[in-house]
Curated annotation (Swiss-Prot):
Cross-referenced PANTHER family: 28S RRNA (CYTOSINE-C(5))-METHYLTRANSFERASE (PTHR22807:SF4), NOP2 YEAST -RELATED NOL1/NOP2/FMU SUN DOMAIN-CONTAINING (PTHR22807)
Active-site residues, record numbering mapped to chain: C359 (nucleophile)
Modified residues (Phosphoserine): S167
Pfam family, one: NSUN5_N
Linked pathology: NSUN5 is located in the Williams-Beuren syndrome (WBS) critical region. WBS results from a hemizygous deletion of several genes on chromosome 7q11.23, thought to arise as a consequence of unequal crossing over between highly homologous low-copy repeat sequences flanking the deleted region. Its deletion in WBS results in decreased methylation of the C(5) position of cytosine 3782 (m5C3782) in 28S rRNA.
Protein name: 28S rRNA (cytosine-C(5))-methyltransferase
Taxonomic lineage of the native organism: Eukaryota, Metazoa, Chordata, Craniata, Vertebrata
Annotated GO MF terms: RNA binding; rRNA (cytosine-C5-)-methyltransferase activity
Cellular component aspect of the GO annotation: nucleolus; nucleoplasm
Positions that bind S-adenosyl-L-methionine: C234, A235, A236, P237, G238, N239, K240, D258, R263, D305
Location (main, coarse): nucleus
InterPro entries: MeTrfase_RsmB-F_NOP2_cat, MeTrfase_RsmB-F_NOP2_dom, NSUN5_7_fdxn-like, NSUN5_RCM1_N, RCMT, SAM-dependent_MTases_sf
GO aspect biological process, one term: positive regulation of translation
Location of N-acetylglycine modifications: G2
């Protein structure tokens, strides 16, 4: 199935409540899930605008075999996207017959609403906020390459490498074909906002991982040395797992758990492309994993990134309207699960270091979960100071919460995120 047909299928599924955008994208069997997800999200964001243009241009009356959802995707690509990919084939020819009329109707809509930019046609809640202006962060996959080789490749393509950034202001100022190394994150390259690398040969070969800046924190802060045994408790879609494997240099073992079979299948493809060979995937509930199982007796490190409200993820608003402000009932349920998962992780007998992370902004899912878990294990574990140079710290809701990290588009040029590093307290002998 081609990109445009796959995107139309996802839009139809969302409209008929068959699932969320992300879930339907992962179950679509389309190979490039990032590309498909981006196209669906942008088409959905402009849905009302596209409906108006298609109706006023009479496109569906003229092309009676053209399905509405496919028409919406194609018109988005023609008028608002990057143009037809791979030449566009018959769809480019079909839309070409109506191109002048569609462009005229879009221009007429702007005049009618008194705006000059496409973005200004959106409802306020759908307009790009700070997150849409974030730089493009690209993690170098050290299982397959190194930063120097990647930098040289981009330089040969006409990009200008500016070295390591000295501050976030350097990242904010990026334009054109300039790129930098992140000031705090090793192996993380930074390109201007809206840089599209989904079709780049290094990405397609698994040499690059497109990953949010804050999403790189959990594996980096867990920092398991090569040869370690690690549990990735809620692993899909797999970017953090591949990061762990890179830190391990594929030496050791990662036990990765997730309950969603389709997400695990996509994750297996992602890990194979990234060259990961030290990971054992299991379709299993982490809460049902026995800490006394001999397989896990050498697990010293656990990464726990459980299901959460996603209130720090701007894209979640497209899938779940209101996700930015989850209801008290939903928060209570999520926090209960998160606390059970964290307390369960702390029962693994050889555990030395754990990273707990969420893409939530809510205190109930973050500081409160960590505080309660530590209180249930008095004297056994403590919060470790994490990345002192990181500017955004945990909320001061209990002593030591400043050791936690928070992230946001405004303060750290990333999605909303929370990270806590928990270490076992060594008992004096």
């Amino acid at each position: 199935m081609g990109l445009y047909a796959a995107a139309a299928g996802v839009l139809a599924g969302v409209e008929s409540r068959q699932g969320s955008i992300k879930g339907l994208v992962y179950s679509s069997n389309f190979q490039n899930v990032k590309q498909l997800y981006a196209l669906v999200c942008e088409t959905q964001r402009y849905s009302a605008v596209l409906d108006a243009v298609i109706a006023s241009a009479g496109l569906l009356r003229a092309e009676k075999k053209l399905r509405p959802h496919l028409a919406k995707v194609l018109v988005y690509e023609l008028l608002l996207g990057k143009g037809f990919r791979g030449g566009g084939g018959r769809w480019k020819a079909l839309l070409g017959r109506h191109q002048a009329r569609l462009k005229a109707e879009l221009a007429r809509l702007k005049v009618h609403r008194g705006v000059s930019r496409n973005e200004d046609l959106l409802e306020v809640g759908s307009r790009p906020g700070p997150a849409s202006q974030l730089p493009r962060f690209v993690r170098v996959n050290t299982l397959k390459t190194c930063s120097d080789d990647v930098v040289d490749y981009f330089k040969r393509q006409g990009f200008s490498y500016q070295g390591r950034a000295s501050s976030l202001d350097d990242l904010r100022a990026l334009k054109g074909k300039h790129f930098l190394l992140d000031p705090l994150m090793p192996e993380l390259l930074v390109f201007p906002a809206q840089t599209d690398l989904h079709e780049h040969p290094l990405y397609r070969a698994g040499h690059l991982i497109l990953q949010d800046r804050a999403s790189c924190l959990p594996a980096m802060l867990l920092d398991p040395p090569p040869g370690s045994h690690v549990i990735d408790a809620c692993a899909a879609p797999g970017n953090k797992t591949s990061h762990l494997a890179a830190l391990l240099k594929n030496q050791g073992k990662i036990f990765a758990f997730d309950l969603d079979a389709k997400r695990l299948a996509s994750m297996a493809t992602l890990l194979a492309r990234a060259g990961v060979s030290c990971c054992e995937l299991a379709e299993e509930d982490f809460l049902a994993v026995s800490p006394s199982d001999p397989r896990y007796h050498e697990v010293h490190y656990i990464l726990l990134d459980p299901s959460c409200s996603g209130s720090g993820m701007p894209s979640r608003q497209l899938e779940e309207p209101g996700a930015g402000t989850p209801s008290p009932v939903r928060l209570h349920a999520l926090a209960g699960f998160q606390q059970r998962a964290l307390c369960h992780a702390l029962t693994f007998p050889s555990l030395q270091r754990l990273v707990y992370s969420t893409c939530s902004l809510c205190q109930e899912e973050n500081e409160d979960v960590v505080r309660d878990a530590l209180q249930q294990n008095p004297g056994a574990f403590r919060l470790a100071p994490a990345l002192p140079a990181w500017p955004h710290r945990g909320l001061s809701t209990f002593p030591g919460a400043e050791h936690c990290l928070r992230a946001s588009p405004e303060t750290t040029l990333s999605s909303g995120f929370f990270v806590a590093v928990i270490e076992r307290v060594e008992v004096p002998r």
